[in-house]
UniProtKB/Swiss-Prot annotation:
Residues 1-20 form the signal peptide. This is Avirulence protein ATR39-2. It is found in: Secreted; Host cell. Belongs to the RxLR effector family. GO terms for cellular component: extracellular region; host cell. A motif (RxLR-dEER) lies at residues 49-66. Its main location: secreted. The RxLR-dEER motif acts to carry the protein into the host cell cytoplasm through binding to cell surface phosphatidylinositol-3-phosphate. Secreted effector that acts as an elicitor of hypersensitive response (HR) specifically on plants carrying defense protein RPP39. The allele ATR39-1 is recognized by RPP39, whereas the ATR39-2 allele is nor recognized. It comes from Hyaloperonospora arabidopsidis (strain Emoy2) (Downy mildew agent). Keywords: Secreted, Signal, Virulence.
Length: 187
């Protein structure tokens, strides 16, 4: 009998495709794949651990609280979304605190950036301004907000560049970008 490991379960789910998510067997495999197992007693035995029947969470009635073990991947993403938005958000009040114009205040949430970068991706490369290209280069090199300010990058150019480079930018860089926006607003 083949033991179902999380890797095997994920492999089967990926092979089955998204249309198969309604199948009860695929749902069960998805649960097996998302279980958060307790750490093994020996470090070298981590790779040898397999799921037991007792590891599989029982179905929970609607309205009841659910263990983190039984969360689907998209439910985990939904729970993390507010944290991401808090991490990468700047409000009109933040920018206005330094007496800056309110026009610089943008809804800079993770979801907003992610959705809007898709449209910006359609911009032909020859239509990207020199200023935006400079900002993109600085973002890629993880420039500090002082370096961005010295290069004369405006908030709007920075936002355009950020939307174009978001898939390749790590959270630390995006964080620095938000600090840069606030820095400009407080000048």
């Amino acid at each position: 009998m083949v033991k179902c490991t999380p890797l095997l379960a994920l492999t089967v789910i990926v092979s089955a495709g998204s249309d198969a998510l309604s199948d009860p067997t695929v749902k069960r495999l998805a649960k097996l794949a998302t279980i958060n197992q307790a750490p093994a007693t020996q470090s070298n035995s981590d790779s040898k651990r397999v799921l037991r029947a007792s590891d599989v969470p029982n179905e929970v009635a609607a309205g009841e609280s659910r263990s983190p073990k039984s969360l689907w991947p998209w439910e985990v993403e939904d729970k993390l979304a507010p944290l991401k938005e808090k991490l990468i958000s700047t409000s009109a009040d933040d920018l206005e605190a330094g007496g800056s114009a309110k026009k610089n205040a943008l809804p800079m949430t993770w979801r907003w950036l992610w959705q809007n970068q898709i449209e910006t991706k359609k911009t032909p490369i020859d239509e990207i301004s020199k200023e935006v290209q400079t900002a993109m280069d600085l973002i890629s090199s993880k420039a500090t907000h002082e370096e961005l300010n010295k290069a004369g990058v405006s908030v709007s150019d920075y936002v355009k560049a950020l939307k174009l480079t978001l898939p390749e930018v790590d959270v630390d860089v995006v964080n620095r970008g938000m600090e840069y926006n606030i820095h400009l607003g407080n000048k």
